[in-house]
Amino acid sequence: MHAPILETALLHHALTLLAPFATDDGSGDGGFTGPSLVDFFPQAFLFEGTPFEINRIMMVRFIAVAVLILLFWLGTRRMRMIPGRGQSLIEMTVGFVQSNIADGALGKEEGKRYMPLLATMFFMVFAMNVTGIVPGLNISGTSVIGVPLVLAVVAYIAFIYAGIKKQGMNFFKSSLFPAGVPPLLYIVVTPIEFLSTFILRPVTLTLRLLMNMIAGHMLLVLCFSATQFFLFTAGGLFGLFSIGTLAFGLIFTIFELLVALLQAYVFTYLTGVYIQLALVEEH
């Protein structure tokens, strides 16, 4: 007798975890309200009003970093010649970054040199991205500009450092005054090179990651909030629509996992490409 009530309560709780944002528009009529940009600016619950205030998104970032550190510690604390499952998984993922990103973008020699930076960046971006599909967290640490911007600045510093270390101050000359261009054309070419190399690279790195994570979050919240609304608020025949919204939400969750991985790959690979371009004497 009580089983259907219990199952309904559990389903409602599960959907609440998947769509933790309000689906009531506040008018009291139970109307549906979709996801909002307000989701990305939650109120602080610790140290409010100080430079160190902590809100929900900051907590998600702390959790992502802590879990990442814990997984690597557990997988590498007892390294063996014949690796266990944890060590094998870490070796496989690190090997993926080494062969497909570091070596692929920079070659073996330079790839080995910049591998620590690129691996750290890849796993950091992926860990921050994937929190968007974790029930109870439900938002990516990279869906607010802070982390994407910091990572883009790191990439920016890395390729400028690589260029100066390799070429000295000639790096700026070769970047702004490409060889083979008629001198008169430098009036046009140099401003374009300056914008594309020193301004647009960090901006596009930041915005590409940020916009993808925002869009993914909005669609997931829309799907699961709509499911909750159709099933528990609208009722009647509208409950049938919840089947479609739930199915689409689950499919899109898998898609978002792939997006999280792809964006980590793209961000890190482009960082490697920018470093490689800085190492070339004339480009």
Explain the meaning of each model-derived region.
Residues 2-283:
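Selective transmembrane helix interface/packing segments
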